């Protein structure tokens, strides 16, 4: 090797090192200037929280950095930092603050008025669509991955799918699935133990199973018995629909964070996830075809798929209307990729978010015997004189479940499945909001995080914010049961100060806020209310005490485990909390 070649390699090495040092420093400088221009307080972090590389390695990197006493470098981008911080970060830095990193600028919002303003300005603060397309774009365009006119179309159609007839399907299948789950717990047939004490060893996976079965029937008309074993794999497939759906949804983070080439050349887990996604897509296309044929024969499946296929799709009609193109347009004149994309979103949201909300609600329920007594009174009143639980009519019973709905609302306040709601400015050049009577301009390509966990634990809006107190919701539930909108009662006054506070918009984000709130809110409520009825008609739930423990000891242990929840796609509980189902009388 010549001296010249040696010098060239040396220069190249120095250049690469300099580039990788200077680039992040320059990025930090640029984003610091942007933060200063907003006039908001700001802090630094060494890594951009939404960097794809960081998302892939942070769970491994964080313990190493912590062990090396370098955790302070990523204080505001470490795993689940905002869930751990709760409202403390806003107490220290203000209701709105910036996080400056080499890769971008993030603005965390914990002010209710600004939260409402941001959610109303959909075009100025759109969702980070690029990220959502990466997660679910494989299945087609959807309400989650669209904006502007396209989003309005998706929202209009998906709103029509969540109808009362569909909610009845959800109600009865939830009663069935929850009753079967309860019987399995009591019989000890949970593949873990043969004892008959009703100890529940796999609450999380059972909640996921229940939610998947319910949403599969409600979305696609496919009923899965609770005790169903491994399904037969159809010819030409590598997985059954249930197997593909379960694996895909359990490993959705791989779709979110991993490049597609890993599906073919990566580790076995990534390859299996790729196979699951491919098979799930093929199964869904087949189900769309079947439902389309049924509609042509005058049959209405009364499911979300059927409702979407009967929607008015101007774009498909512009391309030929109902002139049938088997590749892209259904016989009813609707784009198949649109139906596919939204069906996948229903499956993801109806499975993951409902299951996690139910899991947290059940654990909190078990920890609070006093709350159980209040709920039992309501359940007993509803069930008085009822012999068969399936005789209950959804439209008559659901509005009466005021206190039980309060349990769900309070559980999602303490443990929202999405601790922050992501917005962005992307390439928008005129994004601003009013904060403390001043206009605050947000630069393009910024991430705006509506900090649900921060505002949910703010004692200005929630007295005793760390306390599980469903009664704070009872007044709200009464108003909703009467059909009175919270917006109509903003000046609510009286002795119930909790209820008065609750009517301030932007203080509760468990189901989103504004025009882009969760369209499946009632779906989740119906599913979870029916589950509570089936589980607690004759039983209560208790914490399992370790030898020598009191209830208070077990409560503290369970609460600590809940507080160690971690964010993946949604908030997840990774630690086991033992509870048991026992007869009430």
Swiss-Prot record:
Residues reported in the UniProt entry to bind heme: 518
Q: Might you name a Gene Ontology BP term for this protein?
A: terpenoid biosynthetic process
User: Phenotype upon knockout?
Assistant: Abolishes the production of arthrobotrisins A to D and arthrosporol A, and leads to the accumulation of farnesyl hydroquinone, the first hybrid precursor for biosynthesis of SECs. Shows substantial reduction in conidiation. Develops far more adhesive trapping devices and traps and increases the number of captured nematodes by the traps. Shows significantly increased ammonia levels in fungal mycelia.
| Keywords of the record | Heme, Iron, Metal-binding, Monooxygenase, Oxidoreductase
Enzyme class name = oxidoreductase
**What factors induce this protein?**
Expression is down-regulated by the cluster-specific transcription factor AOL_s00215g275. Expression is also down-regulated by the HOG1-MAPK pathway downstream transcription factor MSN2.
Check the record and name the Gene3D superfamilies matching this protein.
Cytochrome P450
Which InterPro entries does the annotation name? Cyt_P450, Cyt_P450_CS, Cyt_P450_E_grp-I, Cyt_P450_sf, Insect_CytP450_Detox
Identify one Pfam family in the record: p450
Biological role: Cytochrome P450 monooxygenase; part of the gene cluster that mediates the biosynthesis of sesquiterpenyl epoxy-cyclohexenoids (SECs) such as anthrobotrisins and arthrosporols, metabolites that possess a novel hybrid carbon skeleton consisting of a polyketide-derived epoxycyclohexenol combined with a terpenoid-derived monocyclic sesquiterpenol substructure (PKS-PTS hybrid). The SEC pathway plays an important role for fungal soil colonization via decreasing fungal nematode-capturing ability.
UniProt lists the family membership as follows: Belongs to the cytochrome P450 family.
The name of this protein is Cytochrome P450 monooxygenase AOL_s00215g278
Natural source organism: Arthrobotrys oligospora (strain ATCC 24927 / CBS 115.81 / DSM 1491) (Nematode-trapping fungus)
């Amino acid at each position: 090797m010549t001296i010249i070649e040696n010098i060239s390699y040396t220069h190249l090495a120095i250049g690469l090192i300099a580039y990788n040092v200077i680039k992040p420093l320059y990025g930090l400088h640029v984003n610091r200037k942007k933060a200063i221009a907003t006039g908001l307080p700001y802090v630094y972090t060494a890594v951009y929280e939404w960097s794809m590389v960081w998302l892939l390695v942070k769970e491994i990197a964080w313990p190493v950095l912590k062990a090396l006493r370098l955790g302070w470098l990523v204080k505001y981008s470490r795993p689940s930092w905002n869930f751990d911080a709760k409202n403390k970060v806003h107490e220290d830095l203000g209701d709105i603050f910036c996080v400056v990193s080499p890769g971008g600028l993030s603005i965390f919002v914990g002010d209710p008025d600004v939260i409402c303003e941001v959610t109303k300005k959909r075009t100025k603060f759109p969702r980070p669509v690029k990220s959502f397309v990466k997660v679910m774009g494989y299945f087609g365009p959807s309400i989650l991955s669209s904006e502007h006119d396209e989003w309005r179309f998706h929202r209009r159609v998906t709103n029509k799918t969540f109808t009362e007839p569909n909610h009845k399907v959800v109600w009865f299948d939830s009663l069935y699935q929850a009753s079967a789950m309860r019987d399995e717990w009591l019989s000890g047939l949970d593949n873990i133990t043969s004892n008959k004490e009703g100890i529940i060893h796999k609450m999380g996976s059972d909640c996921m199973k229940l939610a998947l079965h319910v949403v599969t029937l409600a979305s696609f008309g496919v009923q899965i018995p609770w005790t169903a074993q491994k399904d037969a794999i159809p010819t030409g497939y590598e997985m059954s629909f249930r197997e593909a759906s379960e694996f895909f949804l359990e490993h959705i983070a791989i779709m979110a964070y991993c490049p597609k080439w890993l599906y073919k050349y990566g580790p076995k887990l990534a390859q299996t996830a790729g196979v699951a996604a491919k098979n799930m897509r093929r199964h869904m296309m087949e189900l769309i075809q079947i439902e389309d044929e049924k509609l042509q024969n005058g049959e209405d499946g009364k499911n979300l798929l059927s409702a979407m296929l009967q929607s008015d799709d101007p774009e498909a009609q512009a391309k030929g209307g109902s002139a049938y193109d088997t590749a892209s347009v259904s016989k009813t004149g609707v784009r198949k990729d649109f139906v596919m994309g939204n069906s996948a979103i229903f499956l993801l949201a109806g499975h993951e978010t409902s299951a996690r909300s139910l899991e947290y609600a059940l654990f909190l329920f078990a920890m609070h015997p006093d709350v159980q007594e209040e709920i039992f009174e309501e359940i007993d009143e509803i069930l008085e004189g009822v012999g068969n639980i399936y005789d209950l009519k959804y439209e008559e019973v659901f509005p009466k479940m005021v206190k039980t709905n309060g349990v769900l609302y309070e559980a999602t306040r303490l443990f929202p499945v999405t601790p922050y709601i992501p917005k962005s400015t992307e390439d928008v050049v005129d994004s601003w909001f009013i904060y403390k009577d001043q206009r605050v301009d947000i630069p393009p390509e910024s991430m705006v995080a509506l900090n649900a966990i921060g505002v949910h634990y703010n004692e200005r809006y929630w007295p005793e914010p760390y306390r599980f107190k469903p009664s704070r919701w009872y007044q709200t539930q009464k108003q909703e049961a009467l059909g009175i909108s919270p917006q109509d009662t903003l000046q609510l006054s009286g002795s119930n100060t909790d209820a008065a506070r609750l009517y301030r918009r932007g203080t509760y984000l468990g189901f989103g806020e504004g025009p882009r709130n969760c369209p499946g809110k009632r779906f989740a409520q119906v599913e979870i209310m029916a589950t509570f009825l089936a589980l607690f008609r004759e039983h209560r739930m208790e914490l399992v005490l370790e030898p020598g423990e009191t209830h208070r000891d077990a409560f503290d242990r369970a609460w600590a485990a809940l507080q160690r929840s971690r964010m993946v796609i949604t908030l997840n509980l990774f630690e086991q909390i033992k509870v048991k189902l026992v007869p009430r009388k």
